């Protein structure tokens, strides 16, 4: 996955720090391309690739945050961007090379 996606023209992937469990793959649309997340979601759906929102995104804006004791020092523009332009594709317990190829190639008619 990392090898196919590291220089992707539309999608940024996470920078791994340490050893990731890779339960899934986060995908974030690169800034400045004029591509909407809804366009990306539709192309993934057409390719029969299931996806979900990134769990946290900007957690400070989630409804549950009002129940937690917390403080936010300032705006969180990166978290807002991930919340608006990111998504998550689940991994499997068996190899899925054909899905990884589909994910890395789907953008050709969206960009």
Provide a role label for each language-model segment.
Residues 1-111:
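PLP-dependent aminotransferase class I/II
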């Amino acid at each position: 996955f990392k090898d196919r996606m590291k220089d992707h023209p539309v999608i940024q992937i996470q920078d791994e720090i340490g050893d990731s469990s890779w339960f899934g793959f986060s995908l974030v649309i690169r800034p400045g391309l004029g591509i909407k997340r809804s366009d990306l979601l539709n192309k993934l759906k057409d390719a029969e690739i299931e996806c979900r929102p990134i769990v946290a995104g900007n957690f400070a804006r989630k409804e549950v945050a009002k129940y937690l004791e917390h403080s936010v020092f300032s705006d969180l523009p990166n978290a807002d961007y991930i919340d608006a332009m990111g998504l998550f594709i689940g991994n499997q317990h068996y190899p899925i090379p054909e899905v990884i190829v589909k994910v890395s190639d789907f953008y050709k008619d969206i960009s």
